[in-house]
Design a protein with these regions (language model features):
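Gly/Ala-rich beta-loop-alpha elbow adjacent to hydrolase catalytic centers
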Residues: 94, 98, 102
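Flexible "cap/lid" loop of the alpha/beta hydrolase fold
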Residues: 103, 107, 114-144, 189
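Catalytic active-site module of serine/aspartate enzymes centered on a nucleophile-bearing elbow/loop
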Residues: 238-267
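Conserved alpha/beta-hydrolase catalytic His-Asp/Glu region
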Residues: 148-198, 205
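Conserved alpha/beta-hydrolase "acid-adjacent" motif
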Residues: 222-228
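Active-site loop/oxyanion-hole signature of alpha/beta-hydrolase fold enzymes
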Residues: 52-93
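Conserved HGGG/HGGXW glycine-rich cap/lid loop of the alpha/beta-hydrolase fold
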Residues: 7-64
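Short beta-strand/loop motif that positions the catalytic acidic residue
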Residues: 209, 215-217
Length: 267
């Protein structure tokens, strides 16, 4: 890991893959996701790409800023990172909340992006928002688990999971992570991130994106419904929309998804 000192915090970041100016990609992780937690996805990307990824503010080693962040702050952090790395133009990959930050970055700095991949995400505003995860924080554990299950995949129930062992493994992993004890600072950071997330809205600015754009979604996503990806597609000229068999984690559920994303980013 390396660090970058910003005015209000120290940003922790890491590089993966073989350095290659033609295959640079800036990766934005999802809600609550750190570099460490996202290594399976990052490592797969790094097999083909020159990856830069950071623990976004409020998460992981980067820690908490002194004030509540905005989506613009998350995009500004990324700009500071690529400027620090000396990257002029590069591809961007954003998944879930990371797709929201990627959109904010793309509408603010469209000239920097060569290709944009947006997975299981939403534009906000009139285009549709993802499930309000901040509302789950204070629910009883059983109710939070029930809603989180359907948010992952609207098909998930006991009968479905009994017949789909891979999906059962996904759910077991989600439940195991939910039992891990967190510090007061970690919990506060997650709340701060989700509070920024609830105000995400790039709907009226999506027309600023002109680079080749792939929008990918799962047909059974309860967090970021496929209709939200269709809305993004309608606002970005020349964009490509691909739908997959799966939910919020379709990139793991549908074997076609990851090769399609890699093919797009390396195209």
């Amino acid at each position: 890991m390396a660090t970058l000192d910003l005015p209000d915090l120290t940003l922790w970041y890491e590089r993966f893959g073989t350095p290659d100016p033609a295959r640079r990609v800036l990766v934005f992780n999802g809600s609550g996701a750190t570099i460490e937690a996202s290594r399976p996805l990052i490592d797969k990307l790094a097999e083909h790409l020159d990856v830069a990824v950071h623990d976004q503010r409020c998460l992981g080693r980067t820690g908490l800023p002194p004030t509540q962040p905005t989506m613009a702050d998350y995009a500004a952090d990324a700009l500071a990172l690529v400027d620090h790395l000396g990257w002029d133009r590069f591809a961007v990959f954003g998944i879930s909340f990371g797709g929201m930050v990627a959109q904010e970055f793309a509408v603010t700095h469209p000239e920097r992006i060569t290709r944009l991949a947006l997975l299981c995400t939403s534009p906000g505003g009139a285009g549709g928002s993802s499930y309000p995860l901040h509302e789950l924080l204070d629910l009883p554990p059983d109710e939070r688990d029930r809603i989180s299950l359907r948010n992952l995949d609207t098909r998930y129930d006991d009968a479905f999971l009994a017949d789909h062992p891979f999906d059962r493994m996904i759910v077991d992993g989600m439940r195991a992570r939910a039992t891990v004890a967190k510090s007061a600072e970690q919990l506060r950071g997650e709340r701060m991130q989700l509070d920024a997330r609830r105000h995400h809205d790039v709907w009226d600015r999506l027309g600023a994106i002109t680079c080749p754009t792939l929008i990918a979604c799962g047909d059974h996503d309860g967090t970021a419904p496929a209709a939200n990806s269709e809305a993004i597609h309608s606002r970005i000229a020349g964009s490509e929309l691909r739908r997959y068999e799966g939910g919020h984690l379709f990139v793991y559920q549908d074997r076609r998804a990851f090769p399609d994303v890699i093919g797009f980013l390396t195209g």
